[in-house]
């Protein structure tokens, strides 16, 4: 068989290991092709046969060696026809798509239309792909966010300030929650739990009066801003951390500073957890291909690897809920809007 591998959407630590592992396993029996720049690579025929030897030197770095894009191959029927034509010309039988909801959704649509068979691997630092407990990149991003927050905390203590740390998270507050819990932040704001900024200001002022510094962690997605959208209709996010810091300073009269971690936590080397997760996911994807199990996404469920139909995953988000929401409300019960 001819198998294509692509990475779509935002980059995340662990992508290169997933690609390398799949290629290393599949090249024993099949021709494996790197599809560069995600789905755009199939529209532009940016496809090249690769071996594990080509990928080994980059396997343990952040980012994605085979590049990525946010191109939607089904934005219109003209693109869809071009995709189908190119797939036939290239002779591809299967695509292994590594990405978040949009990338996986395109894989599912390609499967549904009979353009080519597809297997999905969940990846995003936001950890919001439905149907799996963990996505490639989340653990690495959280560890980077924790390290940066602890460094920021030392300056808050030294200068006796209130600090606001803004982290990524469009719909889901997993990074903010895990970072806040790990650094014992005085307040954490996540998209799933509307919070009163007056309550936040009151809480951090109380903390500041106790020890002369305070810390807030906020998810970028608690407030969307207008402006350009990508091809999947998502707004550009960012800036809420600075706005919240200004609000706290006005409300309390205490100097407040904000830092936006942004893309810096996305490009770090993968942690041990993400490395092993990427290997497990890639191995499961290979086994799915070998067994003709298509239209599925590999998933992590209670420590085991499982398969979930892609159609059951796309269009949904895994949000902070259940146990994790109870934990949030236990630590920060006084932030309700």
From Swiss-Prot:
Q: How is its activity regulated?
A: Non-allosteric.
Return the EC number: 2.7.1.90
Which pathway features in its UniProt record?
A: Carbohydrate degradation; glycolysis; D-glyceraldehyde 3-phosphate and glycerone phosphate from D-glucose: step 3/4
The first-level EC class reads: transferase
> How does this polypeptide assemble, per the annotation?
Homodimer or homotrimer.
UniProt similarity note:
Belongs to the phosphofructokinase type A (PFKA) family. Mixed-substrate PFK group III subfamily.
The protein's name in its UniProt record: Pyrophosphate--fructose 6-phosphate 1-phosphotransferase
Origin species, per record, is: Thermoproteus tenax (strain ATCC 35583 / DSM 2078 / JCM 9277 / NBRC 100435 / Kra 1)
* Taxonomic path: Archaea, Thermoproteota, Thermoprotei, Thermoproteales, Thermoproteaceae
């Amino acid at each position: 068989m001819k198998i294509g591998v692509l990475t779509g959407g935002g980059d995340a630590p662990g992508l290169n290991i997933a690609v390398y592992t799949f290629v290393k396993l599949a090249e024993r029996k099949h021709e494996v092709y790197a599809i560069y720049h995600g789905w755009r690579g199939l529209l532009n025929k940016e496809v090249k046969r690769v071996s594990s030897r080509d990928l080994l030197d980059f396997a343990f770095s952040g980012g994605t060696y085979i590049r990525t894009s946010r191109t939607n191959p089904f934005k219109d029927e003209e693109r869809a026809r071009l995709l189908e034509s190119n797939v036939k010309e290239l002779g591809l039988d299967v695509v292994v798509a590594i990405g978040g909801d949009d990338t996986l959704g395109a894989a599912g649509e390609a499967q549904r239309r009979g353009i080519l068979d597809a297997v999905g691997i969940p990846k995003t630092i936001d950890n919001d792909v439905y149907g799996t407990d963990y996505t490639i990149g989340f653990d690495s991003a959280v560890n980077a966010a924790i390290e940066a927050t602890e460094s920021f905390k030392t300056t808050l203590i030294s200068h006796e300030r209130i600090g606001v740390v803004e982290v990524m998270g469009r719909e889901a507050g997993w990074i903010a929650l895990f970072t806040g819990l790990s650094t014992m932040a005085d307040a954490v704001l996540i998209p799933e739990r509307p919070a009163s900024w007056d309550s936040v200001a009151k809480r951090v002022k109380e903390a500041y009066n106790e020890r002369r510094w305070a810390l807030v962690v906020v998810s970028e997605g608690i407030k969307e801003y207008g402006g350009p959208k990508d091809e999947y209709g998502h707004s550009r996010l960012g800036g809420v951390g600075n706005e919240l810091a200004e609000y706290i300073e006005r409300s309390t009269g205490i100097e407040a500073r904000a830092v936006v971690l942004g893309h810096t936590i996305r490009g770090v080397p993968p942690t041990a957890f993400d490395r092993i997760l990427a290997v497990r996911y890639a191995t499961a994807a290979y086994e799915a291909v070998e067994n003709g199990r298509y239209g599925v996404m590999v998933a992590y469920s209670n420590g085991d690897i499982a398969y979930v139909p892609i159609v059951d995953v796309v269009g949904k988000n895994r949000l902070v809920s259940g146990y994790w929401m109870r934990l949030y409300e236990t630590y920060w019960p006084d932030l309700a809007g």
